[in-house]
């Protein structure tokens, strides 16, 4: 099938779906080439089939392949950005990391080392989980490559800043507390987005505030809208090296039923995609999409959502790689003036301080 791939600008792209049906053949992300089929990848998509850190429903170990299967529907041109990401840069699928499902500490070390190996030549990672435990080693690797503490946006229904759970320091509910303690996050530029639902106590919020996290709740997104949400986030992050971690349960269960710890009242898939599009020009150095658990999915709803979130993250990386003056706002069909509007909202917010 390799001769039936789309090629442009020296980059080997996905299998041509006008010649080979989307449902045919083994699934790689967006039907892209495997890493061993290209000389170098600017962006590497990699799976981490690990869910030994979950506190409720298991099954996220099967998430990466579920997202890959759903990504067969993706097409090479992203009209919301006016970008063909697979033409701008070389994107490849590295398959899955081989991690120990019975030893969380060893798995974390393996993920961190594999991430460092995959980024040794300058490639950026978009990682498909797996549960949220995997974010810690990925952040460690990203901060090491950046040479400094990095900014982070954490899209999630939950805070994931517990201290321990059943005495364990490393679970899917603790990665960002550990990351702050280890000094790998820039605590002036970290925020949760989409949080909601009951907590064990107010101390959870007090601790989170003490660590430096900003919080944009799902209700904030609903009442303030995408534009103000994006403006506030951009104002907080600036141009720092940025890592984006997306727990699919940030979405309402109507949009993402296939996850281990669902919470009612989430944001929509449209809101999530539009928020990411509003980050055009930001310095994204790595990203993950985690907690997709296909056993609880219906008609690939969650897999499709996860595949599109990853696609927007890859597009953001590809768009940043293009030189010239194209770093305006995504056209977003009806949102031609998004960039200018974000600036207006940001100025208004600044005037209220």
UniProtKB/Swiss-Prot annotation:
Q: Which InterPro entries match?
A: Agmatinase-rel, Ureohydrolase, Ureohydrolase_dom_sf, Ureohydrolase_Mn_BS
Residues given in the record as Zn(2+) 2 binding sites: 156, 158, 247, 249
Q: Which CDD domains match?
A: Agmatinase_PAH
Q: Return one GO MF term.
A: agmatinase activity
Give the enzyme's main class according to its UniProt record, as a single word.
hydrolase
Q: Where does Zn(2+) 1 bind?
A: 132, 156, 160, 247
Q: What is its EC number?
A: 3.5.3.7
Which NCBIfam families does this UniProt record tie to the protein? agmatinase, PRK02190.1
What protein is this chain from? Guanidinobutyrase
Q: What is the lineage of its organism?
A: Bacteria, Bacillati, Actinomycetota, Actinomycetes, Micrococcales
């Amino acid at each position: 099938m390799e001769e039936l791939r789309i090629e442009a600008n020296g980059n080997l792209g996905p299998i041509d779906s006008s010649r080979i049906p989307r449902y045919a053949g083994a699934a790689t992300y967006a039907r892209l080439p495997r890493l061993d089929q290209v000389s170098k990848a600017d962006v590497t998509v990699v799976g981490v089939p690990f869910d030994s850190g979950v506190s409720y429903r298991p099954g996220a170990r099967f998430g990466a392949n579920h997202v890959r299967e759903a990504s067969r529907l993706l097409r090479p041109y992203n009209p919301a950005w006016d970008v063909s990401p697979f033409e701008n840069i070389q994107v490849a699928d590295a398959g899955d990391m081989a991690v120990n499902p019975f030893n969380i500490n060893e798995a974390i070390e393996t993920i961190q080392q594999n991430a460092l190996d995959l980024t040794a030549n300058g490639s950026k990672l978009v990682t498909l989980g797996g549960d949220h435990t995997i974010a810690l080693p990925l952040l460690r690797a990203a901060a090491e490559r950046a040479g400094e503490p990095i900014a982070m946006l954490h899209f999630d229904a939950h805070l994931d800043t517990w201290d321990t759970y059943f005495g364990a320091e490393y679970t899917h509910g603790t990665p960002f507390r550990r990351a702050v303690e280890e000094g790998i996050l820039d605590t002036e530029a970290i925020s949760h987005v989409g949080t909601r639902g009951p907590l064990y106590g107010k101390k959870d919020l007090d601790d989170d505030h003490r660590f430096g996290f900003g919080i944009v709740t799902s209700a904030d997104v609903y009442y303030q809208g995408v534009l103000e949400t994006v403006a506030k986030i951009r104002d907080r992050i600036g141009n720092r090296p940025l890592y984006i971690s997306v727990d699919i349960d940030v979405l309402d269960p109507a949009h993402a039923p296939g996850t281990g710890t669902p919470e009612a009242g989430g944001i929509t898939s449209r809101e999530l995609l539009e928020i990411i599009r509003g980050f055009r020009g930001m310095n994204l150095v790595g990203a993950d999409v985690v907690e997709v658990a296909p056993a609880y999915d219906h008609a690939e709803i969650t897999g499709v959502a996860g595949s599109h979130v990853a696609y927007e993250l890859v597009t953001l990386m590809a768009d940043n790689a293009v030189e010239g003056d194209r770093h305006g706002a995504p056209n977003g069909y009806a949102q031609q003036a998004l960039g200018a509007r974000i600036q207006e909202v940001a100025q208004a917010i600044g005037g209220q301080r």
